Amino acid sequence: MVSLNKRDKSAKQSYTKQVMDHFINPRNQGGMKNPDGKGTVGNPVCGDIMTLYIKVKKNKKGEEILTDICFETLGCGAAIATSSIITEMAKGKTMEKAWKISNLHVADELGGLPPQKMHCSNLAASALKSAIRKYYKDKKEKPAFLSE
């Protein structure tokens, strides 16, 4: 079980049950061997760093599906929770649908975040987009949705 640091204990009351659950019991945490895409982002102000790893396969329709996703995050409870929830939100989606997951979707899925922690949802969405961009860059492809 992950222990709360002093700052997170005082913030516990402002975190939703979903945030606390994903912080204490993060899903899909850890690295990945030979990912198809990897995105790392950080915030120099708070020091949070997130890395998301993705695996992609084509389904019977020929659509590229995000079949596996995991994360490594160094940061506060909200950073860990947003990393955890975005892996659940993106897994099994087409790459285009995963690309459209925004920071607001992440925060909503967690039942909201304190205003001072919304930057964590930005990092999670940016890390996912970075991993997807890297996947297509390595394939030397640029689907139209990447422009959005």
Residue positions per predicted region:
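C-terminal binding/interaction regions
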Residues: V2-N34, K38-G39, K57, T67, ...
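Short connector loops at helix/strand junctions that flank enzyme active sites
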Residues: N34, G47-I49, E64-L66, A81
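Short Gly/Pro-enriched turn/cap motifs at secondary-structure boundaries
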Residues: T40-V45
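Short, thiol/selenol-centered motifs that function as redox-active sites or metal-ligating centers
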Residues: C46, T73-A81, C120
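Short beta-strand elements
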Residues: D48-K58
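Immediate flanking context of iron-sulfur cluster ligation sites
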Residues: E63-L74, G111
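Alpha-helical support elements that line or immediately flank enzyme active sites
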Residues: A78-K93
